[in-house]
Amino acid sequence: AIDAIDEVHVVTNHKFGEVFRSWAGSAAENWPQVKFKVWDDGTLSNETRLGALGDIQYVIDHAKLDDDVLITASDTFCTFDWKKFYIDFQSHGRDLLLAHEEKTLEECKRFAVALLDDEGRVMDLAEKPEHPKSKTAVYAAYIYRRDTLPLLKDYLAEGNSADAPGHFPAWLYQRRDVRAFVFEGECVDIGTLDTYNEVCVRYNKKPH
């Protein structure tokens, strides 16, 4: 766990609002030192959804966030030590992406793909490229500095994509230094119930 985390904000569409509020109640019992807040963006369809980045902006606005933030997709299961990710951010003081070296370029087509220099700075970043330039895949986990948060509104105001969260750092690295933390371990995108149950069995959790 990252001891510096004192608030957890979860944003959802209206359909799953009650489910997440129930989860937050249980989570608060396990982590009483952390304040949990669920935000219902009020949307009910693909036509009205805000998109991942639109939802992040929704929380920034409504929660009046003014702090460094860790943003991650709730459907990603990772086995690495999150503390190391945060320590890297503290050490360098730059916006930080979570990355992993994949085995093949074909696998990378499902992710944002980064080119890094020897110090881990992002030199190129593209969301789900048809022709990946490296095997460094960027996962949906980011630590952004407090002074980076207002830039998301600028990004959206320019008419850029509000959907996949990887689009924002692809815009951001061209304007300020962005680094990547390359982790060792596994991250699984839980896109189906079968994948969820598989992960539960492998890591001795109770499947549903």
Q: For the regions a protein language model found, what residue spans apply to each?
A:
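Conserved beta-strand termini and adjacent loop/short-helix elements that scaffold enzyme active sites
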Residues: 11, 39-41, 99, 128, ...
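Short, surface-exposed amphipathic charged segments that create phosphate/polyanion-binding patches used
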Residues: 48-57, 111-115, 140, 194-198
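Conserved N-terminal catalytic core of the sugar/cofactor nucleotidyltransferase
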Residues: 1-72, 77, 82
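Short acidic-glycine loop/turn motifs at beta-strand connectors
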Residues: 115-121
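Conserved donor-nucleotide/metal-binding helix-loop-beta segment in metal-dependent transferases, i.e.
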Residues: 80-109
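A short acidic, often aromatic-flanked loop/helix-cap motif at beta-alpha or helix-coil junctions
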Residues: 42-48, 105-106, 131, 187-189
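Short, surface-exposed charged micro-motifs
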Residues: 35, 113-115, 179
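Catalytic-core segments of class I nucleotidyltransferases/pyrophosphorylases
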Residues: 77, 86-90, 121-208
